[in-house]
């Protein structure tokens, strides 16, 4: 994606033994109508056989600790409908109505206040 190699973008991976089982990409980007330093979670995926085991939760919590360290104020994402419950369980809140991302399906913007 555009911006993936920017100085203020970062990418995380969760390994089990030597197998990459979960990834997440973050990009410093302010959300419209939000103040402060924002980061967008631009993509996250976990191998199907490892879903529901807390791997994504651990990876995202690691990212949140890092974002506190770089003085980010909030993290936001365009969450797929099937992932709403996951993000809500981490403290994210809805900040938009449902919308369709062409070729992917229903989404809602969500955010988490970091500091």
Where are these regions (language model features)?
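Conserved GNAT acetyl-CoA-binding A-motif
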Residues: 67-80
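Conserved short alpha-helix immediately C-terminal to the canonical SAM/SAH-binding motif I
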Residues: 59, 83-86
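A conserved beta-turn-beta hairpin within the catalytic core of GNAT-like acetyltransferases
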Residues: 29-41, 51, 104-107
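Conserved catalytic-core motifs of GNAT/GCN5-like acyltransferases
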Residues: 76-78, 93-109
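Conserved active-site tyrosine of GNAT-family acetyltransferases
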Residues: 87, 92
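Conserved acetyl-CoA pyrophosphate-binding loop and the N-cap/start of the following alpha-helix
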Residues: 50, 54-62
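Short loop/turn motifs at secondary-structure junctions and domain boundaries
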Residues: 2-7
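Conserved beta-strand in the GNAT
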Residues: 13, 19-29, 40-45
């Amino acid at each position: 994606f555009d911006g993936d190699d920017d100085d203020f973008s970062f990418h995380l991976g969760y390994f089990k033994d030597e197998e990459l089982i979960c990834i997440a990409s973050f990009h410093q980007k302010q959300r419209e109508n939000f103040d402060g330093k924002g980061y967008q979670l631009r993509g996250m995926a976990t191998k199907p056989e490892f879903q529901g085991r807390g791997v994504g939760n651990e990876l995202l919590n690691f990212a949140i600790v890092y974002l506190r360290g770089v003085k980010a104020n909030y993290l936001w994402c365009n969450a797929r409908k099937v992932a709403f419950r996951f993000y809500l369980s981490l403290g994210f809140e809805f900040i938009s109505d449902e919308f369709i991302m062409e070729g992917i399906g229903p989404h809602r913007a969500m955010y988490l206040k970091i500091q």
